[in-house]
Regions:
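Membrane-interface transmembrane helices that cradle and orient dolichyl/undecaprenyl
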Residues: 15, 146-147, 184-197, 223, ...
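Transmembrane-helix motifs of polytopic, lipid-linked glycan transferases
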Residues: 115-143
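Perimembrane helix-loop-helix junctions
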Residues: 4, 16-18, 29, 200, ...
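Signature aromatic-anchored transmembrane alpha helix within multi-pass, membrane-resident enzymes
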Residues: 39-43, 146-154, 235-243, 293-294, ...
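Catalytic lumenal/periplasmic loop and adjoining terminal transmembrane helix
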Residues: 54-60, 250, 390-523
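Specific aromatic-rich, kink-prone transmembrane helix
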Residues: 127, 177-201, 344-348
């Protein structure tokens, strides 16, 4: 009886223990995904904050293409019936997916897009570090034994952010760094055994660059055969890529292949040997030490017969081959289109650095004493010392490259802050000139080609509806409103205005320019808070719109042709002495010879 009682009690205790283990296992089962999701949310928030601070601190502003992408979103939200993709920039579905929802926030769209582009570019370093960390094969070790993999990840992350041309692309808010990040994110997801997420990243990258189509298609075939439950996702992704690239242009432009048509005859196309030209652009993304490190990683992959490393090497080579084919077709094959394979090579170089460090450190102390006694151990010790020496030489040879990149970043940031001044002041100039509606009423807006999309975005117009050939438009005698950057601000001039509109359009003629820098004397009579900001130098230059008096001659920038070959295609400023007049002051018939008028703002109303 006692035996049966003890047997039942032991069984109940075992059952209770198994139930506890089941509950604890279940709790760990749902806690781990939550922890992973929380960590990713934290990293995403930090990267987003870094992107916003990068936008604020560096003066990053969108370029011609990026303003054109933002115009697409604003046109769909504000004037969807007039939305068209007929002109520059080339159609990219990836950017449209972001600029469309951002357009709902008005002019905050600029901040949202620039911060998103900056954050995505900075995230490329994160995914490069994670990919190199996993490629070392040391991720399953204890934390303290992973230090070679951590060094490999740091090397790859910093190396990708140091790609030549990446600072400029980040500061003008283009989509190319974003595509680099998506490709590296797909690699990281695949190495983390998340093929569905990897395919989704490849689909997004394929919406940004056509070179990714080949890799997305190959990965779709592999997922269809090897990954259970992924066929619906694969089918949707395969259909989304051509739909995004061709359906919308077919509905909003004269050609469904408008992106390829606009890329033909681009100024960056290669005119000589296409193969040599593309390879030269690819190798120019980094200096010789990094090239040798990537080549060493490829040799190491061949020696070890690592399929993953060899597959990544083949993918990088295939990307370069696709770019060569594009160059033969007449497309530009620019340097920024080769950043993706260069980033993959840097990841491989970082992983090779990690494996060399692990080989040099693994059992080095244990083999140091026997190395002095036996030849076999001595040879192994020499190999370990050689691996460590290679890493040290690589680090020393990259030190000048790091200094050059720091100087490059400083120069790019300084230039970006200068370029940001007229871009930021254009919105205020448009407001002081009466707003977009009045400006469009007075005539077609015209500016220089570099500011065409910027002006279109500020006036809520399509890029193609803004003129960019100033001289031709001025001499055409059609009603126009001419915008020209001047003295940190803008000159706005309505020209050839219809007689019935002249009274209403008189307000449009302004000189919105810098009149001074706030000083301590400026703070007199201001509220205390504003005066404190003036004294501390928080406020920037003071801008004042100056309007022209009625009847004054318009001072505009025109385009004239001269008989002398050296004076052709020069811009002339009416009301200011022209450069050709100073070189030939006695030349007869020159319209500006010996003439010097008052500045445009003298005597004007404030």
């Amino acid at each position: 009886m006692a035996a049966s009682t003890s047997l039942r009690s032991s069984r109940s205790a075992a059952a209770s223990d198994s139930a506890k283990r089941t509950r604890s296992g279940a709790s760990r089962g749902w806690r781990r995904p939550l922890a992973v999701a929380g960590s990713w949310l934290l990293v995403g928030a930090l990267v987003a904050l870094a992107g916003y601070e990068f936008y604020r601190w560096t003066g990053a502003r969108p370029s011609y293409d990026a303003f054109g992408w933002m115009v697409w979103g604003r046109q769909v939200v504000l004037h969807w019936s007039s939305f068209n993709t007929d002109g520059a920039p080339s159609w990219k579905p990836l950017t449209f997916l972001l600029t469309l929802p951002y357009a709902l926030f008005g002019h905050t769209q600029l901040t949202l897009w620039t911060a998103t582009s900056s954050a995505a570019a900075l995230a490329s370093g994160v995914f490069a570090a994670r990919s190199a960390f996993r490629l070392t094969g040391l991720a399953s070790r204890p934390l303290l034994a992973r230090w070679p993999a951590l060094i490999a990840g740091t090397f790859a992350g910093v190396g990708v952010l140091g790609l030549r041309g990446l600072p400029h692309q980040m500061l003008i808010a283009t989509s190319d760094p974003m595509v680099v990040t998506l490709c590296l994110a797909a690699l990281d997801a695949h190495l983390s055994r998340r093929p569905r997420l990897a395919f989704a990243m490849l689909v997004l990258a394929a919406l940004g660059r056509p070179e990714v189509w080949t890799f997305a298609g190959a990965y779709a075939v592999w997922c269809w055969r090897a990954v259970r439950g992924s066929r619906i996702l694969v089918a949707a992704g395969v259909l989304l890529i051509p739909a995004g690239w061709f359906v919308i242009p077919a509905l909003t432009s004269h050609s469904w292949f408008i992106s390829g048509d606009l890329a033909l005859g681009f100024r960056d196309q290669i005119y000589g040997n296409k193969i040599v030209g593309v390879f030269d652009r690819f190798t120019s993304l980094y200096e010789l030490p990094m090239q040798l490190a990537a080549l060493g990683a490829i040799v190491l992959a061949v020696v070890r017969r690592d399929r993953t490393w060899l597959a990544l090497t083949a993918a990088a080579a295939l990307w370069v081959a696709i770019e060569i084919a594009f160059a033969y077709h007449g497309w530009p094959a620019s340097q920024r289109y080769l950043m993706e394979p260069a980033a993959v090579c840097i990841v491989l170089a970082g992983a090779a650095v990690g494996q060399l460090l692990d080989f040099a450190a693994r059992g080095a102390a244990a083999h140091l004493l026997p190395a002095l006694l036996t030849r076999q151990s001595f040879g192994e010790w020499v190999l370990r010392a050689g691996a460590l020496s290679l890493v040290a030489v690589l680090a020393l040879s990259l030190a000048p490259v790091v200094r050059a990149r720091v100087r490059l970043w400083r120069g790019e940031i300084h230039h970006a802050k200068i370029v940001a001044v007229p871009i930021d002041q254009l919105e205020h100039a448009v407001a002081f000139a009466g707003g977009p509606t009045l400006i469009r009423y007075c005539g077609q807006p015209v500016t220089f080609v570099g500011f065409q999309s910027t002006l279109a975005w500020n006036l809520d117009m399509n890029v193609g509806n803004v003129g960019y050939k100033a001289g031709r438009e001025i001499h055409s005698r059609r009603p126009i409103v001419f915008f020209a950057p001047f003295n940190g601000g803008w000159l706005v001039r309505p020209l050839h205005t219809r007689r019935r509109k002249q009274l209403a359009c008189r307000r449009v003629s302004i000189d919105y320019q810098v009149v001074g820098q706030p000083t301590g004397a400026t703070a007199a009579g201001l509220p205390p808070a504003l005066a404190r900001e003036v004294r501390e130098g928080v406020l920037g230059p003071l801008y004042v719109p100056r309007r022209l008096r009625p009847g004054r001659p318009h001072h505009v920038i025109t385009h004239r042709r001269h008989r002398s070959s050296h004076a052709r295609s020069r811009h002339h400023v009416k009301g200011h002495r022209h450069a050709a007049a100073s070189r030939h002051p006695n030349r007869r018939g020159h319209p500006h010879a010996g003439h010097q008028s008052r500045p445009a703002h003298r005597g004007a109303k404030t």
